[in-house]
A protein has these predicted regions:
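DNA-recognition alpha helix
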Residues: 83-95
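Basic amphipathic alpha-helical segments that dock to polyanions
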Residues: 103-113
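Short capping segments at the starts of secondary-structure elements
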Residues: 77-82
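C-terminal regulatory/oligomerization modules of transcriptional regulators
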Residues: 2-30, 37-48, 154-186
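Non-DNA-binding regulatory cores of transcription-related proteins
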Residues: 112-186
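Short alpha-helical segments that sit at the start of domains
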Residues: 39-71
Length: 186
């Protein structure tokens, strides 16, 4: 069941963001060194959203229709997507006016609860590959094609914890981005 009913125009707009169905890495669990490119089929997206709804309900959080729509568009995006791109897609899919602050509040919710990440370099958003697992990740950003891969390894968390303890620094957010050229573009 798809709760986000897109109009024909918004479907055309979103087609550029739809990833290929066979590029999803179902084995990635961030338990050891791993890299993940989150690209999901429609069925996987529906299962992911159902799980997130269930998790939010269990935690007493509201996963509103707008939050779901924003999250769905981010899951559909083949590359990181900006807030105003999301706003444009939402506007084209709705008869109502969607105000930028409501989109930003939805993005803040998704960020705060680990469902999406925001790249510091481009301010664009993309879905977390393991939203139910708390982890510190680095992001490999290709300068040629714009692809982003999420990378996680236990040593990243260990190193950051050691730095925090040795400097008595209370970290509030961590964004690690490596910019370069992906294997496909080399």
């Amino acid at each position: 069941m798809i709760l986000f009913d897109m109009t024909q125009r918004s479907i055309q707009s979103a087609r550029n963001f739809i990833p290929s169905a066979n590029s999803y890495d179902a084995n990635c669990r961030h338990l050891s060194m791993s890299m993940c490119r989150l690209q999901m089929t429609a069925e996987q997206i529906e299962a992911q959203i159902a799980q997130i709804k269930q998790d939010c309900q269990a935690q007493g959080l509201r996963f509103t229709a707008l939050r779901e729509q924003v999250y769905r568009l981010i899951l559909l995006a083949a590359q990181p997507i900006g807030a105003y791109e999301l706003l444009d897609l939402l506007q084209s899919a709705s008869e109502k006016v969607v105000a930028p602050p409501t989109v930003y509040r939805s993005l803040e919710f998704l960020l705060r609860h680990g469902l999406v990440h925001q790249l510091n370099s481009s301010k664009a958003f993309f879905a977390c590959s393991q939203p139910t697992d708390r982890h510190v990740a680095a992001f490999l950003v290709c300068r040629c094609c714009g692809e982003v891969q999420e990378f996680s390894h236990p040593s990243i968390q260990t190193m950051l914890t050691e730095v925090e303890q040795s400097t008595n620094f209370a970290t509030q957010s961590i964004i690690i981005e490596l910019s370069g050229i992906c294997q496909r573009c080399q």
